[in-house]
Structures are given as structure tokens and as C-alpha cells.
Amino acid sequence: MKIRIQKLIVIFFMVTSGFSQNENRFTLVGEIKDSLTRTHIPYATISVLDTNTKRVHAGTISDEDGRFHLEVNLSNFYVEVSYIGFETQKFTKLTPSQNKIDLRTIFLKGNSEQLEVVNVRAEKSRTQFKLDRKVFNVGKDIASTGMSALEVLNNVPSVNVNIEGEVSLRGSTGVQILIDGKPSVLADDSSNALGTITAEMIESVEVITNPSAKYDAEGTAGVLNIILKKEERRGINGSVSLNTGTPDNHSVGVSLNKRTEKFNLFTQFGAGYRSLPRDNENINKNKNSNTELLSEGYAYRNEIFYNLILGTDYHINDRNVLTLTGNYAFEIEDQPSKIYYQDYNNTVLENKWNRTGDTEATNPKWQYDLNYKKEFRNNKEHTLLISALGRFFGKELTSEFLNSTTFGANNDKDQQIETNFQQADYTFKLDYTNPVSKRFSIEAGSQYVVNDVGNDYEVRDNSGMEFIVNPDFTNNFEYVQKVLAFYGTTSYEINKWGLKLGLRIENTDVSTFLTNTQTANSDIYTDFFPSVHTSYKINDGFSVQSGYSRRIYRPRLWHLNPFFNIQDNYNIRTGNPNLLPEYTDSYEFTGVYEFDNISLSSSVYHKKTRDVMERIAVFDDTTTTSTLFNLGSRKTTGIEVNGKYAPLNWLSMNGDFNAYQFDRKGTYKNQNFGFSGKRWSSRLTTKIQFPLDLDFEITGTYNSSYKTVQGQMAGFGFADIGFRKKIFEGKGVLNISVRDVFASRVRERVIDSDTTYQYSFSQRGRFVALGFSYGFGKGEAMSYSGGRR
């Protein structure tokens, strides 16, 4: 039969500060499962309604394990539990016992007919605060239309992505990016990372600033875990979506799943074309000789991309599940560029020339993931997980750069570049969890990771008759890293207090080989990574946690490879094969406050890092070459506040603020690079819900200026806006978004010393996107996006 779900106004975390008591106050708890498959139902809606007015008094949604916990202050009430595609259950005549009502396990039955009318479905909060992490729910971010995963990260609290695609967490770039809790070929931290993952594919992003020993120790700043959508509703469900935008950003996406008693089959496919322009400007000045080189120009990254995910869950029985997932992505790149040079001597223009570049590349990526999970009879939290993951990324790139003189001395030059890059990674994991008792649990596991990378780089100069290999810029660089890890954690909870101790041991075997110089480097080392976390629940509205962990950030191939990037012959970047890993000791104290319409998370943190990797620029007349070195230590102390406030049913605000002070110590070639500085950033998002299912969202972001090892980065602010309109009775969604409304998001750096002056500026500009999506079966409309900034 057809069911019309009553319009819900769901207020998340309806809890009080607990400093006062009320005779009608009680806690409502329970667990929700599918009556047929006996699997948990996450994100089901639990509503407490006033018996007299029939209006919603309080509400929440079930978590990933189908559980819910809700504080209620009402005497005459009834409870409704609902989920799309299932019959709503109603509970009346409930009486609290010792200020608590336990509904135990609630089994929802599937509807025999498809829901045709859904007025309002309970929505997850945009940001959820937990003691050990923050969860950013992408579906609630209206401005995500037209975004890629990289742009989604830039909207996540504590995270910043600059216009070069570099991801930082609380100002530190040592970030480990995972997908569904695992490393992925789609999430490496190169400039092309996350390009084929789109906002439509993402359920949420978890920000973990102080991970336990269970997590890979990689990433001194912490962990960003991107959770992809994986539909598990019974029957056939799906969504299709279309996006278009300017600059060129066009994509189509399809998501399908079919769930039976034994199998859950799922697939996602996306394809599109996007154009990513960037304007650049540079000034290199030698104060001693009074010579100056000015350059300005543009570069485009035009991409055709495809991404296909196929997977299945096989429920062998109630306690054993086998999951197999495959992912294939392919990108075709075209990167035209042009730079205009002007060479001055004592303010007199002497030479002018242009450098035109044309780069073409293909990037195949594939990955497989096999998992087996066993739940033991005595407790469903008693589990064994075995997984094997393989991934491959390749890049075949050809470039040609042509210098054309327009004034002065002859600077004509014709160069070709050919790159063949291949990376293969293999990860094997075993994780065991045993809740020995209600208060005591243990975790143990191991992991073995192999990274095998090769980069064949060749530069050829035109001699007039033919192109001849330039040995100064040509090399074949090989990099192999093997990491074997073991970990164990134990946790104890009593009343309102909890303690978790952990230790991780990692043995690293890394080797590099530079073919053209026959230079080999190798290193084997073992590290211990302890972690300590403790928490105390002062009352239902206020909890605190403190934590300590030790982390590592190992140099990547592009950090180690000494090849020169010659796209701009006067601003060159190169790697250093002698780099050592960074080590960080991280301390943090966090409080989470939850009131009637306010949630607040505040943290004080301190980090100590040694062997800091820093890029140092070396000036030679008007040419700048920047290379990475290990420069001493860094101490960082900061405060971070994240909050959400919903003063009215139609108005909500989310904000975050991060400020820290840092102290750097280090020397290079007898030059002191020690300095101190401050940096802060803030973000505020306001969402307004209008009648007729129309939502509006505006986000303002500001990043302050700050000191670098050799100069100063300028501060900047930018704004994004978005509109969303539900149509076709909620099955369709129309989105419009404008990112960087005022074209003010820039990267601007100044290095000013006694002998040299360098200025660099780059900008992407405004992006506008329009998206439409439609859900069928029991699915909902989604907003597939194909863009990346």
C-alpha cells in the first residue's frame, strides 16, 4: 500500500548540557534491523512526537550500526521509526524506567509497493562531531555541485586545498588520504590526485587528527578517510545525473545496486570532460646585478575522464561476508600553456620571447579489493577481517616546448619531453577485534605494503636537424618501498570514563636507483608508534578526550626524484634522493558540547616534528631552482573550534576556526632558517531552507598570511554559493553552484632577501556549475559532479 510519511523536522543531537534536571527527561535507545536480511539499517529516522499536537518534538537517525541514542524531555509522546522502502513502526504507551526507554531491536519490514510520495526525509547533519573524529556529510553540502573529491576536501573542517591541489590539515601537508579506510590509487597526493572521484560518489569524509595505533602510521598531520556511497537497500535502486558548467565542466553519472538476501551488487560509472585554467605571474630579480626577469602566462589542464566501480557483497551466512570490488579509471589529458618573458637590465628591456607548451598524457588506473569478514557467535563486535588490495597507476606523457624570440637576443629553443611513469602497490591486512567484556576489548593486526614505482624521464633538444637527448635532464628513477607492520590496542571503559592504549611497530625497507648516474640509495629502519587516548563523559551534553600519537611522513617519489621540471626554465622544481622521513609527536585535548540547537567541538593541540622537509629556493641570476631538504624541527601549538547552530527550523550555520603558532629551527649550508610565526583560517557556512523544497547555501573562507622558510604567503578569502531544488516529489534534484564568486582565491608568495627578490602569483578564477539528478527504484536523487579545481 501507498504510505505518505508525515513531514519531519529532525533536530540532531537533542541533548542538554546536563547541569539541570527535569522530571520528564529520559533517554531513548534501540537498534534497527531489516526483518528479512537481519542486517543493520543505518540512517533510519527516529522521531518523538507530541501526543496532543502530533508535532515532532525530537529526532535523530541511526548510526552505521543501526543504533540510536536520543535525549527526550516530554511526558505525553509516541515514537515513530521509519526508513524509505520500509513500513513505519509506531510505539505508544511507553514508560521510562530509571529515566531510560530501551526499544531493543526494532525489525522494519520492507514495503510490498514502491513509495511514490515522500514529502521530507530526515537528513544527516552537514557536520557531526565525535570524540575521535569529525564527519563531514557531503550530501548536505549544496555547493558541492560540480565538484571533484579534491574540491570536496576544501569544504571539510580543518582541511585546506591550495590551487595547486596540495592538501593540508591544520596547516600541515603530511596528510594520509584513505578511501573506505584503505589507501587507493585514486587518492595519492600527486597533483592529479582524486580527479576521477566525484562528489556524487562520496557519502562522507572523516577527519582524524590523532589516529590510534590501529591506523597506518603514515601522515604526520593525520588521516582523511573518504567514505564512498554503497547502497544496500533491497531491490533495484539507482540514480542518474547530468552536470554542465563553465569553464567547460560536463559529466554524466550512473549508480545502480541490487540487493537480495545473499548478494548486494553495486556499480557506479562516471564520464566527463573538464577544463581547468590557471593564470601565472612571476618576477625574479637579482639585486646585485640589477637584472630582472618578468613572466606571465596561462596553462590549461583539459581532461576527458572515465571511472567505473563494480562490486558485490556475498553474505555467506549471518556471520560471514565476502566482498569483492574492482575499480578502473582512465584520463586523457591535454595541457596547452604559454608564457611571455621580458628580460630587463638596469630597468632597460633587453629581450622578449614566448614559451609555448603542448602536453598530452594518458593515465590508466585500476584497483581490486578483496575482503572477508567473520562475526563470531558470542558477539557481533567480535570480528576477523582479512583483506588484499592491489592497485596500479600509469602515465604516458609527451610534451613539446618552443621558445620564440620577439625582441633582442636569440632565445629560440625547441625541446621535447617524454615520461613513462608506473606505480604498483599491494596491501595485505589482517584485523582482529574482540570485546572480551562490556568494559574491556582488544584489537590486533598486521599489514604488509609494497610500493614499486618507476619514472622514465627524457628531454630532447632540437639541434636544427633532429632532436638529441639532453643527458643533463634525462633519467630513469626507480623506487621500491616495503613496510611490514604489527599493532595491538586495548581499551577499557567504566561508567563515564574510557582509556585506550596502543602500540604499532613498522619496519621500512626503501631503495632508490638513478640509472643515468648509477646512483643507489637504500635504508632499512624500524619504528615504534605508541598511542594513548582517554575520554570522560561529564554528562549527556559534554564529553572530553585527550590523546597522544606518534606519526611518520615518508618522502614520496616526487620528493626523492632529482629530475628537473622544465615547463618554466626559470622557475625549476626538483627532488632530493637523500631525504629522511619526518616524525611527529602529537598531543591533543578535545571537548564536545551538545545543546538543544548548538553543537560545539573545541581542541587544543601541540605537535613536535623533527627532520622537517622544506623546499629551499636557490637563486642563480634570474633562475630559481627549489629543492627539498630536511631542515631541523618544528613546534606547533594551536586551537581549533568547530560548531553548528540551528536557531530556527529553516536556518542553520556551520563554522570552523583554526589558529596556531609555530616555531622553526634549522640550518642549511651555514645559513640559519629558524623563525617563528602565526597562522589562522576560518570558514562559515549558512544554509537557508525556503518553502517549496528550495535550499540556499553560502560559504565564506579566509586564510591568513603567514611566514615561510624564505618568504611570506599572502592571505586571501573566497566565497561559494549554491542552490538546490527538489522536484518530481523528491526523486529529482536541481543544483546550481558558483565557486570562488569574486575570483579571489589566489596563491601569492614573496621572497625578499638582501640579494634577491622573487614574486609568484597564480589563480584559477570563478567556476559555475548546473546539475540535475534523478533517483529511481528506492533510490534518491544524487548530484554527480565532474569538476576539479
Where do the model's predicted regions map?
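Outer membrane beta-barrel strand-and-loop segments of large Gram-negative receptors
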Residues: 296, 416, 425-429, 470-475, ...
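Outer-membrane beta-barrel translocator/receptor signature
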Residues: 217-224, 232-281, 303-306
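Short, acidic Ser/Thr/Gly-rich low-complexity loop/linker segments typical of extracellular
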Residues: 51-67
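Surface-exposed extracellular loop regions of Gram-negative outer-membrane beta-barrel proteins
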Residues: 222, 226-238, 279, 283, 509-511, 540-586, 606-626, 706, ...
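Short, acidic, small-residue-rich periplasmic hinge/interaction motif at the N-terminus
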Residues: 33-37, 45-49, 82-86, 100-142, ...
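Short acidic/polar hinge/loop motifs at secondary-structure boundaries
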Residues: 71, 149, 155, 182-209
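N-terminal periplasmic accessory domains that precede
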Residues: 100-107, 149-152, 192-193, 207, ...
